[in-house]
Amino acid sequence: MGTILIADDDKTCRDSIQKVLEREGHKVRAAASVDGAIEALGTDHFDLVVCDYRMPGKTGIDLLIELRRLNSAVPVLMISAFADALVEAAVKRLGALDVLKKPIRRQELVARTAKVVGG
């Protein structure tokens, strides 16, 4: 099982994702902002980051840019209620593995996570 970081300003969504992933046996840490995620990434190792695209202040795009600046190879799954083809293309160009559309289906989250970290 993997160690996963969730970055989402929506507490309900963040808690829901955390609960699903913990039930699958993953160790999960959550952050309510991009800055919180960057701080967590500086102190711990993660096998995967699940990050919301649109958050107040810095966005998921900002997180991807910061990860690349730090030469981090941690895989990122972006989540968004606003994802369209342009958003998907932009985040993939910056290194995200894929975009999961909100509301996230449990089965899809489990399957995408398992592809990256096993489970």
Regions found by a protein language model. Name each.
Residues R14, P56, D84:
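The feature encodes the CheY-like receiver
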Residues C51-D52:
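Active-site T/S-Asp motif of two-component receiver
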Residues K11-R29, L94:
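Two-component/phosphorelay signaling modules centered on CheY-like receiver
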Residues S33, T59-D62, G95:
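Acidic catalytic/metal-coordinating carboxylates
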Residues A30-L48, R69:
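Acidic, metal-coordinating helix/loop segments flanking the phosphotransfer/catalytic sites
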Residues L86, I104-T113:
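C-terminal output helix
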Residues E39, I61-A73:
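Short amphipathic alpha-helix used as the core "switch/output" element in two-component signaling
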